[in-house]
């Protein structure tokens, strides 16, 4: 796996799924391929994106700044600086300085990532802030190692809370989660549908599923009534894909 592929993988792992994620993936690919070099416009676009947390925006801004060739005097952006200040915690700043000194001795991406993984996400973000504010310099490879370690820390905690939700025994949460997933699947079916006959059929199935979820939410139902709803939808979607000659490995 190339270095940039690895960076893209880690960065996208902390972006919530949805149309915005696809858009960010495209921007990252363009930046890494040298097709998009207008850092000013990229940062303006990033600043106004909804849904993303300030830290995710800060990390993306840091990656864009590292990758785009920019004028030396180009102003640093406040929204990135604020996100990478380690919540203003002096403890994070102390650790960030110690980490920075260690990173100065590293020359490889993997070496930097290994060193960085033993620090908290707050200290890692502060260290990125030091580099972003030009208070310290490391090689681009080392900076990318720091980015990936930060994303791994964040993705780990996200995965943990996601797993807690999936394994919860609370029937109300499980029921709501099934309905949310059914709605999301219905949306995906509508987006994939082209203009063929089968597309109309897929739209119909998706629309029915949405109406069912809406009705269940309006009148309130027994928590077990949604069991199988998402699975039925997925079966319909996979059957539709086969007829259309589209194969999605794991659509879950």
From Swiss-Prot:
<comment type="function">
    <text>Determines the virion's shape: spherical or filamentous. Clinical isolates of influenza are characterized by the presence of significant proportion of filamentous virions, whereas after multiple passage on eggs or cell culture, virions have only spherical morphology. Filamentous virions are thought to be important to infect neighboring cells, and spherical virions more suited to spread through aerosol between hosts organisms.</text>
</comment>
<comment type="function">
    <text>Plays critical roles in virus replication, from virus entry and uncoating to assembly and budding of the virus particle. M1 binding to ribonucleocapsids (RNPs) in nucleus seems to inhibit viral transcription. Interaction of viral NEP with M1-RNP is thought to promote nuclear export of the complex, which is targeted to the virion assembly site at the apical plasma membrane in polarized epithelial cells. Interactions with NA and HA may bring M1, a non-raft-associated protein, into lipid rafts. Forms a continuous shell on the inner side of the lipid bilayer in virion, where it binds the RNP.</text>
</comment>
<feature type="region of interest" description="RNP-binding">
    <location>
        <begin position="165"/>
        <end position="252"/>
    </location>
</feature>
<dbReference type="InterPro" id="IPR015799">
    <property type="entry name" value="Flu_matrix_M1_N_sub2"/>
</dbReference>
<protein>
    <recommendedName>
        <fullName>Matrix protein 1</fullName>
    </recommendedName>
</protein>
<keyword id="KW-1048">Host nucleus</keyword>
<dbReference type="GO" id="GO:0016020">
    <property type="term" value="C:membrane"/>
</dbReference>
<feature type="short sequence motif" description="Nuclear localization signal">
    <location>
        <begin position="101"/>
        <end position="105"/>
    </location>
</feature>
<comment type="subunit">
    <text>Homodimer and homomultimer. Interacts with NEP. Binds ribonucleocapsid by both interacting with genomic RNA and NP protein. May interact with HA and NA. Cannot bind NP without genomic RNA.</text>
</comment>
<dbReference type="GO" id="GO:0003723">
    <property type="term" value="F:RNA binding"/>
</dbReference>
<dbReference type="InterPro" id="IPR036039">
    <property type="entry name" value="Flu_matrix_M1"/>
</dbReference>
<keyword id="KW-0472">Membrane</keyword>
<dbReference type="Pfam" id="PF08289">
    <property type="entry name" value="Flu_M1_C"/>
</dbReference>
<dbReference type="Pfam" id="PF00598">
    <property type="entry name" value="Flu_M1"/>
</dbReference>
<keyword id="KW-0946">Virion</keyword>
<dbReference type="GO" id="GO:0046761">
    <property type="term" value="P:viral budding from plasma membrane"/>
</dbReference>
<keyword id="KW-0694">RNA-binding</keyword>
<dbReference type="InterPro" id="IPR001561">
    <property type="entry name" value="Flu_matrix_M1_N"/>
</dbReference>
<feature type="region of interest" description="Membrane-binding">
    <location>
        <begin position="1"/>
        <end position="164"/>
    </location>
</feature>
<comment type="similarity">
    <text>Belongs to the influenza viruses Matrix protein M1 family.</text>
</comment>
<dbReference type="GO" id="GO:0042025">
    <property type="term" value="C:host cell nucleus"/>
</dbReference>
<dbReference type="GO" id="GO:0055036">
    <property type="term" value="C:virion membrane"/>
</dbReference>
<dbReference type="InterPro" id="IPR013188">
    <property type="entry name" value="Flu_matrix_M1_C"/>
</dbReference>
<keyword id="KW-0468">Viral matrix protein</keyword>
<dbReference type="InterPro" id="IPR015423">
    <property type="entry name" value="Flu_matrix_M1_N_sub1"/>
</dbReference>
<dbReference type="InterPro" id="IPR037533">
    <property type="entry name" value="INFV_M1"/>
</dbReference>
<dbReference type="GO" id="GO:0039660">
    <property type="term" value="F:structural constituent of virion"/>
</dbReference>
């Amino acid at each position: 796996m190339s270095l940039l592929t690895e960076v893209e993988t880690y960065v996208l792992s902390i972006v919530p799924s949805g149309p915005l994620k696809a858009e960010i993936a495209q921007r990252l690919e363009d930046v890494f391929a040298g097709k998009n070099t207008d850092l000013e416009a990229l940062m303006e676009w990033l600043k106004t994106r909804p849904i993303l947390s300030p830290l995710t925006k800060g990390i993306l801004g840091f990656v864009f700044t590292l990758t785009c060739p920019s004028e030396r005097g180009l102003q640093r952006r406040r929204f990135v600086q604020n996100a990478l200040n380690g919540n203003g915690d002096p403890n994070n700043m102390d650790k960030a300085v110690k980490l920075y000194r260690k990173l100065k001795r590293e020359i490889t991406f993997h070496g930097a990532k290994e060193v960085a993984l033993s620090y908290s996400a707050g200290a890692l973000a502060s260290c990125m802030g030091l580099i972003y504010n030009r208070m310290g310099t490391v090689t681009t490879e080392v900076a990318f190692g720091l980015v990936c370690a930060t994303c791994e820390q964040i993705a780990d905690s996200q995965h943990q809370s996601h797993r807690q939700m999936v394994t919860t025994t609370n029937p109300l949460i499980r029921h709501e989660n099934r309905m949310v997933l059914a709605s999301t699947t219905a949306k995906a079916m509508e987006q994939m549908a082209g203009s063929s006959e089968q597309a109309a059929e897929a739209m119909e199935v998706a629309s029915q599923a949405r109406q069912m979820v809406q009705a269940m939410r309006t009148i309130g139902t027994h928590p077990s009534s949604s069991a199988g709803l998402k699975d039925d939808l997925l079966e319909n979607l996979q059957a539709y894909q086969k007829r259309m000659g589209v194969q999605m490995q794991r659509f879950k």
